[in-house]
Every structure is written in structure tokens, then in C-alpha cells.
């Protein structure tokens, strides 16, 4: 047999029907659902008198528009209707739901892995582009639209065009203070927001091997920001250890059997990717976005670029739009940019590793008077664990707000909004115009960088924190 | 689904790169549980000023583009979120065809599922179209069967389209109904899965 990449292996294992000159019909192992992109799909089933084919492969939670304070009081009537619709749909069609009363509730991409629903080798879909997160386990996971949600609900399959394969290799050792978020931002900064279009990414190299599962999820999460629907990391002992003994993970002999299968999920020597790119991990700095898409990103110790630095006319035009929207001027030092808001949360950075990194930075310090800072744990389970470790107290004593789990200020569908013209250091994934509120200015950073910005009121190179520590 | 064989309409140009789905339909309009009625919210933050009046600076608000049903957009159109509300909003606004040098994958797929045709066009050909249609009130015909765009001024340009989606659009097939015919194949596949996946 020809050597194959892990991407091709998982793909081939899931072909129900090979389409000659057509897309393949792929089997879907896990379908995750939330309140925003599913109501129209369930309505479609109802209209046609169709059923959910495999409720046991389907799991729902609510995350996008729920409040993070007084979570049971959804004041927005339209949002409330959406939450009620999910409850009704899950009950009518027999789908498991982790609602606001459940200890399993949280951001869909945080709870899937926590509950052991996300496992290596699975095909996983959800009506949400950040489904790529689950690729961290060596699963083929991608976002779909609502029509496809309906298709999966009724058939447990999807017609998909075989993707091209792209290797993103990062070797070396990260500097102290440089995190998974900085790695993925550096990749997107170098290659742009569409280099992954039409591809599935496999992240390879020492840097990813040395990451925790939380960190791998951060990387895979932002594959979509590079244009790739999916990005994955081949599973290893770190993955197996994480999956063991989770609520829905197979147990005992079944687990051992699964691990044996998972061990084969790696790219064969000699397999060829359609494209490969390589980055030196030693040279990656803490990153800060300055513009209106995640590709407009720079090391914290640099300056906002000048329009002349863009060779393509379209890029220059976009940069000029970005200065205006972001209220920045060319050559302004990134470290001089002041922020009024700090948001630590989202499916990119709201897990234990993220909260621990942020808490490390702020222990015994105070949030600057000019800053409002909030921490939104990714799930109820993260919230409880963080409280057990006393992280909530570290945040609260520093002046952060400690909230209930949800998507919150990543897309500001609930009341967690950044006011017009104000600036936010955010650990989320998109700095698009209006993403955190109309006219809100978003700078994407790692949890450690966000925490430092909260303390100082402006961006600070987190590497300085470690230098100071060494001197003392 | 309504079959789409050929479409004639006015073309409008939105020459910006990386137009994301947050711009096409901002999140405050994703709370509804209906599939229709999103057209009035399309490009909301660009389209209206602080007083809710049409923003004269926004390209699609130009009088020459009113009533357009073909959108000539920039590179990487529809990037970002998977929200199908984006094609729903464009469709409801009146756009049936979108022509761009490149599209984001999920958005591209979502268009087909709604009977809309996204056409990927080589950059130079696209640039030529922009030149012909920018700031003008001009009709074009997009003939999907012949894979040809032409207008009354004698301009003609061919385009590529995935044969699978061409067939689906021309016949207006319902994808789920077709897949349900493969029930036996799906059952057969399910019977061969590893036991740990059956749980």
C-alpha cells in the first residue's frame, strides 16, 4: 500500500460510498450541537417527518448566547427562544443535552474533549467553524453549515470533497512565555488567512509534541483562521492519557483495543503532503494582532506596519481600513497600545492550562484602574477545577471578574460586549470588525499576554516577566 | 430546491478582500430560529450609519447597484464563521450568484446547499469583470449549463464549476433525499465499525 498521511487514513476509514468524480459520502462519528446553528435543521426534519438517525452519536449543549452572570436569566427574548428551542428539539428527537443546570455544560469545543466524546480517529462535525479544535486528538473535525447539520442528523453522513493535505511543521523549543497561541498566530502571520483553504492541516514537529492537550486544542482551533476547515495532530501517549477514564470514553479492554487502533493513526514514512511549510519554534515571539483579521499580527516588540510595507495593492487597502477601524497609526509601538478591556476565555483559550498561565502572571498584583478584566472558564468542569486550585481567588483578588462558562465576549452574542471605540486584549480567535461589539477594537493574544495587559493597562512582552523572575 | 440553470440580473461589485461572515451577517442577528428574513440585516454594520440611515460610502448602497442579483466580490469571500445565515442573508437580499477569485471553504459549500452559485474565477478574468461592472448598472447572464457568462455588450467569459454541484443545482435536487436512498450502504458501513465506536 502507498504510504499515507494520517488525514488520508482517517478519511479512507470513513468512506461509506466513494464518489467517482464526485464528493465521497463520509460517515460521521460524533455530531456536536449548540443553540445557534441547529434550530433550522431540526425544523427541517420536522417538516419532512424525518428522525435523528443516531441520537447516541449526537450531543448538545448551550454556549453561544447564554449569560455569564445570572445565567438563568436570559433577558433577550429572541435569545431565550433559541435556548428553549434547543431544549424542545433535544427532547423531541432524543438527543443528550447538557443544559445550564448540567455540570457538563460549557463551550461545545471544551466539553466534547472533557467528556471523552472527542477521541482519536473519529470524524467530528458541529455547526461551528471552530470544530477544528477537536483535531488536537487526531480526529478529523470540521465546521459545517445548518443544511449539513440537518443532513448529518438524518443520515449520519456528509458528502465531502477529498481535501488536499498540508503539513505545518514547527521544530525547536519555545522561549519561556511563548505559548501555543503565539505559535498559531505566528504561522497565520507568516502565511496569511487563506493558505489553508482547500486543505486539512497536520501539525508536526517537536513543538506540538511537547504541548499539553489544552495547548494542542488552541493550535487546532485556529486552523480555520488560516482557511483550513480542519487541522490535526497525530495522537500519542499524551492524548491517550488525557482520554483515559473520561465520562464517555470506552473503559477497560475496550479502551486498550481503541488505543491499539489509535497507535496506527500516524503519517507513514514517505507519505507526501500536497504542501509543507516549516517554522523555527525558537524564533517565535509573543504575538499581538493589530488589524482586522488574524493574519494582521506581529511580535509584541515591534511596530504597527507602514502602508508602504505591503506590496499588493489589495493588502495595502485593507491595512488602511485596519488603521482607521483600530484607531492606530503606522510605526506606533505595539507595547504602547493601551487597552480598556481584557477577556480571558473562548474555545481557543479557556481551559486549565490557559487559566493557570494567566494566573501565574497576576498573582499578588492588581488590574490597572483603567482596565475591566473578565475570566470566563470554558466549561463548568473547568470552573470547578480552577476553584479547587484556588485560581478564582487569584483572579478575584487581582480585580478580575470570575464568570460562568460560555462563549461570552469571543463573539458577544450575550451581554458581554466591548463598547464602540474601546480596545480589548482578548484570548479569543477573531479580530474581525464588530466581532466583540460594533466598533470594538480587538487584539488577539495568549492568556499570559492578556493577563500582563490587564495589570499594566497596555501590552507588555511577557518574556520580561520571566527575566525579572530570574534576576530576583 | 429551485433548479438554477441560467440567471440574468444586474451585477454589483464589492471589491474588498477577506470579507468575513461577521460582516455579511453580524452576530446580533443570529438569535432568530427562522431560515428566512435575513436580507435586511446583510452587511448591517457597513450598510447603515449610527442613525440607521443607509451609509452612502458603502459600495452596495450606490444607486446603480440597486436591485442587483449577482455579486462580484473580492478574494477569500465568506471567511470566518460557518454560519449559514450568511448565504441566507445574501440570498434574501437578492444575490443568487457570487463571483470571486476565492472563497472560504465552508461558505462556498453553504451557498450550493441553498441553491446559490459561487463561481471561483481566475484572478485576471475576475479583474476584467470588475473593470467592466464597477460603478455601472449593467446586466449579465450566467449560464450554468454552458458555464458561460455573457452580457449585452458582447463580453463573454467561461467559468469552471464542480460537476457534482452543477448537476445538483441544475436539477434542484434535495441532497438529503438522495442520501437516504443509500440507507443500505450506510447500514452496511455501520455494521463493520470497531466496537469502541459503537458505544
UniProtKB/Swiss-Prot annotation, chain A:
Description of how the protein assembles with itself and partners: Heterodimer of LeuC and LeuD.
Listed EC numbers: 4.2.1.33
Reaction(s) catalysed by this chain's protein: (2R,3S)-3-isopropylmalate = (2S)-2-isopropylmalate
Keywords: 4Fe-4S, Amino-acid biosynthesis, Branched-chain amino acid biosynthesis, Iron, Iron-sulfur, Leucine biosynthesis, Lyase, Metal-binding
Species annotation: Bacillus subtilis (strain 168)
Protein name in the entry: 3-isopropylmalate dehydratase large subunit
One GO BP annotation of this record: L-leucine biosynthetic process
Disulfide-bond pairs as recorded: none
Record family assignment: Belongs to the aconitase/IPM isomerase family. LeuC type 1 subfamily.
Pathway: Amino-acid biosynthesis; L-leucine biosynthesis; L-leucine from 3-methyl-2-oxobutanoate: step 2/4
Cofactor annotation: [4Fe-4S] cluster
InterPro entries: 3-IsopropMal_deHydase_lsu, Acnase/IPM_dHydase_lsu_aba_1/3, Acoase/IPM_deHydtase_lsu_aba, Aconitase_4Fe-4S_BS, Aconitase_4Fe-4S_dom, IPM_dehydratase_rel_enz, IPMI_cat
Upregulation: By superoxide.
Gene3D superfamilies: Aconitase, domain 3
Record PANTHER family: 3-ISOPROPYLMALATE DEHYDRATASE (PTHR43822:SF9), HOMOACONITASE, MITOCHONDRIAL-RELATED (PTHR43822)
GO MF annotations, alphabetized: 3-isopropylmalate dehydratase activity; 4 iron, 4 sulfur cluster binding; metal ion binding
Amino acid at each position: 500500500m502507498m504510504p499515507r498521511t494520517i488525514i488520508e487514513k482517517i478519511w479512507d476509514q470513513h468512506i461509506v460510498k466513494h464518489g467517482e468524480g464526485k464528493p465521497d459520502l463520509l460517515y460521521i462519528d460524533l455530531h456536536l450541537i449548540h443553540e445557534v446553528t441547529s434550530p433550522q435543521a431540526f425544523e427541517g426534519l420536522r417538516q419532512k417527518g424525518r428522525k435523528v438517525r443516531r441520537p447516541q452519536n449526537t450531543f448538545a449543549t448551550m454556549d453561544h448566547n447564554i449569560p455569564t452572570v445570572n445565567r438563568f436569566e436570559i433577558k433577550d427574548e429572541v435569545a431565550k427562544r433559541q435556548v428553549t428551542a434547543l431544549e424542545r428539539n433535544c427532547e423531541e428527537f432524543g438527543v443528550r443535552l447538557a443544559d445550564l443546570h448540567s455540570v457538563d455544560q460549557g463551550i461545545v469545543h471544551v466539553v466534547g474533549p472533557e467528556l471523552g466524546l472527542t477521541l482519536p480517529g473519529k470524524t467530528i462535525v458541529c455547526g461551528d467553524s471552530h470544530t477544528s479544535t477537536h483535531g488536537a486528538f487526531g480526529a478529523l473535525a470540521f465546521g459545517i453549515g445548518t443544511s449539513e447539520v440537518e443532513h448529518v442528523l438524518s443520515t449520519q453522513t456528509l458528502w465531502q470533497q477529498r481535501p488536499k493535505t498540508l503539513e505545518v511543521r514547527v521544530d525547536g523549543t519555545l522561549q519561556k512565555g511563548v505559548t501555543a497561541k503565539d505559535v498559531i498566530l505566528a504561522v497565520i502571520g507568516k502565511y496569511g488567512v487563506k493558505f489553508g483553504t482547500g486543505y486539512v492541516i497536520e501539525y508536526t514537529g517537536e513543538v506540538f509534541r511537547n504541548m499539553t492537550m489544552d495547548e494542542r486544542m488552541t493550535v487546532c482551533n485556529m486552523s480555520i483562521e488560516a482557511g483550513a476547515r480542519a487541522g490535526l495532530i497525530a495522537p500519542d501517549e499524551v492524548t491517550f492519557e488525557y482520554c483515559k477514564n473520561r465520562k464517555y470514553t470506552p473503559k477497560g479492554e475496550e479502551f486498550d483495543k481503541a488505543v491499539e487502533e489509535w497507535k496506527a493513526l500516524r503519517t507513514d514514512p514517505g507519505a507526501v503532503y500536497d504542501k509543507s511549510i516549516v517554522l523555527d519554534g525558537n524564533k517565535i515571539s509573543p504575538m499581538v494582532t493589530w488589524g482586522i483579521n488574524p493574519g494582521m499580527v506581529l511580535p509584541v516588540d515591534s511596530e504597527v506596519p507602514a502602508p508602504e510595507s505591503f506590496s499588493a495593492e489589495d493588502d495595502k487597502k485593507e491595512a488602511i481600513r485596519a488603521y482607521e477601524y483600530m484607531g492606530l497609526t503606522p510605526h506606533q509601538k505595539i507595547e504602547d497600545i493601551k487597552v480598556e478591556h481584557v477577556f480571558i476565555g473562548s474555545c481557543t483559550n479557556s481551559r486549565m492550562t490557559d487559566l493557570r498561565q494567566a494566573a501565574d502572571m497576576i498573582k499578588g498584583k492588581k488590574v490597572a484602574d483603567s482596565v475591566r478584566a473578565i475570566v470566563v472558564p470554558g466549561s463548568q468542569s473547568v470552573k470547578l477545577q480552577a476553584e479547587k486550585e484556588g485560581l478564582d481567588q487569584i483572579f478575584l483578588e487581582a480585580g478580575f471578574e470570575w464568570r460562568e462558562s460560555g462563549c461570552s465576549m469571543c463573539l458577544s452574542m450575550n451581554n458581554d460586549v466591548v463598547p464602540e471605540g474601546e480596545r480589548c486584549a482578548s484570548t479569543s480567535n477573531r479580530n474581525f470588525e464588530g466581532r466583540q461589539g460594533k466598533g470594538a477594537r480587538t487584539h488577539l493574544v495568549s492568556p499570559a499576554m492578556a493577563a500582563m495587559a490587564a495589570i499594566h493597562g497596555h501590552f507588555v512582552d511577557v518574556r520580561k516577566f520571566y527575566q525579572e523572575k530570574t534576576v530576583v | 430546491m429551485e433548479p438554477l440553470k441560467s440567471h440574468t440580473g444586474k451585477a454589483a461589485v464589492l471589491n474588498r478582500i477577506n470579507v468575513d461572515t461577521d460582516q455579511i451577517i453580524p452576530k446580533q442577528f443570529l438569535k432568530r430560529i427562522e431560515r428566512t428574513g435575513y436580507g435586511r440585516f446583510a452587511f448591517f454594520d457597513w450598510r447603515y450609519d449610527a442613525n440607521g440611515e443607509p451609509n452612502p460610502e458603502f459600495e452596495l448602497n450606490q444607486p446603480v447597484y440597486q436591485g442587483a442579483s449577482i455579486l462580484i466580490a473580492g478574494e477569500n469571500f465568506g471567511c470566518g464563521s460557518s454560519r449559514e445565515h450568511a448565504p441566507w442573508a445574501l440570498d434574501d437580499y437578492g444575490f443568487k450568484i457570487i463571483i470571486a477569485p476565492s472563497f472560504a471553504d465552508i461558505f462556498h459549500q453553504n451557498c450550493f446547499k441553498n441553491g446559490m452559485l459561487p463561481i471561483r474565477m481566475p484572478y485576471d478574468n475576475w479583474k476584467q469583470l470588475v473593470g467592466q461592472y464597477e460603478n455601472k448598472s449593467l446586466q449579465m447572464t450566467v449560464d450554468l449549463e454552458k458555464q458561460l457568462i455573457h452580457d449585452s455588450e458582447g463580453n463573454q467569459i467561461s467559468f469552471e464549476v464542480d460537476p457534482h454541484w452543477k448537476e445538483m443545482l441544475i436539477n434542484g435536487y434535495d441532497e438529503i433525499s438522495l442520501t437516504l436512498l443509500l440507507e443500505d450502504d450506510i447500514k452496511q458501513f455501520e455494521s463493520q465499525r470497531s466496537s469502541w465506536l459503537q458505544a
